[in-house]
Amino acid sequence: MNAADEENRSMAVERRSLYEEESTDLPLLRIESRSEDGAESRWIVGYAAKFGVNSLDLGDFVERIDPQAFGIVAERRGRKKPLETRALWNHDPNFPLARYPGTLRMNVDEIGLRYEFPVPDTTYGRDLAANIEAGIVRGSSF
């Protein structure tokens, strides 16, 4: 492999992380165990976006999310028919994790756009939870 091949190869790698890991003191994604009505459940809890933090270099620019960017989340609660939002594994509609309204809960707080949903009882849901717990999957996007 020559230098040109190396350069092309590195340019073909898709970046799936928005933030430098060192720049975040709060985990962007974790598993929580909860007890509701006597039943134990595991929840995936995370931030799809954090306010006031520069993204990784996305080419010739970086993104910085404004705290007003997700005002629509609050607006959805007041509608007769809420706008549907889906949590998907790797943005793939073949791997749904949760849906709003339904099992997906979202809110905007002082940190960013927070979400949570119960770990789905599917092979990919359990695999995702195991990868989060192992630190292999560390974040998400929106």
Residue ranges and their predicted role:
Residues M1-S141:
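Signature of dsDNA virion morphogenesis modules
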